Amino acid sequence: MSTCLTVTKGIAISSLGLYAGIVSAGTLLVVNDRVTPTNDSKHDLVRTLLCKVGTGLNVVATVVFGLVYFSSPGYARHPYLVYAALTGPATSLYMFLSKRYWLKQLRNLKETKITDEKHSPPPVGQDAAQTSDKAEISYAAAAAVGAENGGELSESVVDLGIEKTIAQAEKDFEKQKADEVVRRETQSIKVRAVATAVIATVGFIQSVIGVSGEHL
C-alpha cells in the first residue's frame, strides 16, 4: 500500500510539475512579447496541442492528488495533498473569472469611447472655435485653388474641406480607440498569465516540499 501511494504521489507531482512548467514557459513568452497573433495553421496547431496537454496534466494532477488523499490512512492525510489537488481548479477558476472581468472592462471601454465621442457635449467655446478654424483653413485652401484656376470660390468647396477634415479626425479617433483596446487586451493577457504561473508554481513547490517532509 505504501509503495502504491508513493508511486501515485510521484505521478501526481510529475503531472503538476509539467503543468506548471508549460504555464510558466508560456508566461515568459507572453511577457517578453514573443507571442504575436498569427494566421499560420502550424502555430495555431501547436498552441492548441499545448493547451490540451496542459489541461490534461491539470486534470490528472487534481484527480490523482485527490485519490492519494482519500486513499491514505488518517495520519498520512497531510494538508499539502489538498493544496496540491486544488491548484488546478484554482488556476482554471482564476482564468475563467479574470477573463470575464477583462472582457467586461474592454466592452465598457469601447462603449464609453463611442458614447463620449458621439453624445457628450464639447467644452464651452471649443466646438465653435474648432469649427471656425476648420472653416478658415478650408476657405483659405479653396480660395487659393480658385485663384489659381481663375474661378469663383464655391461654398460647396468649403463644405467639402470641412467634411474631409472631420472625416479624418473621426478616422484618427477610431485608430486611437483600436490601439487602446489592443493595449488593454495585451495587458490583461500578461497579468492573467503571470498570476496563473505563480499559482501553479507555488502549488508544485509546496507539494514537493510536502512529500520531502514525509521522509524526514
UniProtKB/Swiss-Prot annotation:
One of its GO terms (biological process) is autophagy of mitochondrion. InterPro entries: ATG33 (IPR051668). It is a multi-pass membrane protein. It is found in: Mitochondrion membrane. Disulfide bonds: none annotated. The chain crosses the membrane at residues 11-31, 50-70, 78-98, 193-213. The keyword Transmembrane applies. Its main location: mitochondrion. Keywords: Autophagy, Membrane, Mitochondrion, Transmembrane, Transmembrane helix. One of its GO terms (cellular component) is mitochondrial outer membrane. It comes from the Eukaryota. Involved in the selective degradation of mitochondria via autophagy during starvation and at post-log phase. Belongs to the ATG33 family. This is Autophagy-related protein 33. The gene is ATG33.
